Amino acid sequence: MNPVIVQKPGFKVAGYGIETNVAEGNYTKDIASFWSHYEGENLESKMYELLNPPKHGEVGLCVPAFDSGNATYLLGVIVEDFSRVTDDMLTVNVPEAEYAVFTTLPVDTSEGKDQEEFVQVIKSTWRYIFEEWFPGSGYVYDEGRLNFEYYDERCHSRADTVMEIYVPVRERAGK
């Protein structure tokens, strides 16, 4: 699984999210709970209706607050500005960065199929990135930038569902 290296300009994301504490280990459970709420309350449709983004695609990202151990997890869409954002939404300005873009292996999530395999493929892709790809690559993780997951039309009830993981990178010193 080789990534594509891209330079991506900064962009704005608006959507719904939660505050969680990474240091206390609640992060994974809190995000799973948020996803259930997101789907149960049909927040995706509401978000598209209110924000009217120029392109289909959801962005999942985590913005850490290093001093407190807290983080904001946001699931949103890319918008041109924040003029249509409502009080119950969160916003993030994602800065320009160089990214290694990984596309997950395809999974069948067509109608009636369990989504758990897709979730596991996403988790295993993250593991691969940090445990296998980074150590053997000419790159290091750029901790000053944000990573994010991107879910476009290729991840909605298809026999070949995939999504992309954008990991900020910079060239390893002495490469």
What is each PLM-predicted segment?
Residues 1-175:
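A solvent-exposed interaction/effector surface
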